[in-house]
Amino acid sequence: MSTSSWRSPAPPVGPRVPVWAPQAARVDLHLPATGEVVPMEAREHGWWVSPRPLPTGTDYAYRLDGGDDLPDPRSAWQPDGVHGPSRVFDASHLTWTDDGWRGRDLLGAVIYELHVGTFTPEGTLDAAARRLDHLTGLGVDMVELMPVAGFPGRAGWGYDGVDLWAVHEAYGGPAALARFVDAAH
């Protein structure tokens, strides 16, 4: 197996959901909401792209060589868990209020390592954001989140992540992570 192809970056295609499948002879995009199966277009170095952009919020899965539905391994949103279809998430629509934040010196800072699932009874990023004042009152200067990548089930430490770019849905998904980051700054 060649190692040079996997280092090739994904083609810049925007919301056309590229996937790297160098051994596949055919890759289809399955859209569960309509049942549509769309053949993807082969690109160089083993990349495949959908023939048209997908709107934000569209659920999709890949089928390699006529096989079962597979989630996007680079998905940012897995609303039905790590084995379910992926959903298009457009981070450009997020609203940020932390433009004035300029950071702080790490030297002498009190850093709190936060596990989202156990920090509050709800176990969500939104609930954790509501408790940031509590941490500040304890003298905490910075929060370091333990891994938030998608994993099977509801409870985990995050080190067994499956969808490394997707925020665990039980924590609130990618939009909740953005709200938490905004609140923390």
Which residue ranges define each predicted feature?
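The feature marks proteins involved in alpha-glucan
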Residues: 1-16, 37, 42-123, 134
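Conserved, mostly hydrophobic/aromatic
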Residues: 19, 62, 114, 135, ...
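Short proline/glycine-enriched turn/loop motifs at strand-loop junctions of beta-rich domains
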Residues: 20-27, 55
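Short beta-strand elements bearing conserved aromatic residues within extracellular beta-rich modules
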Residues: 27-29, 60
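Residues that line or immediately flank small-molecule/substrate-binding pockets and catalytic motifs
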Residues: 31, 118, 147
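Short secondary-structure subsegments characteristic of cysteine-rich extracellular domains
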Residues: 128-134
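Alpha-helical scaffolding segments of alpha/beta enzyme cores, especially the outer helices
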Residues: 130, 179-182
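Aromatic-lined carbohydrate-binding/catalytic grooves of carbohydrate-active enzymes
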Residues: 134-179
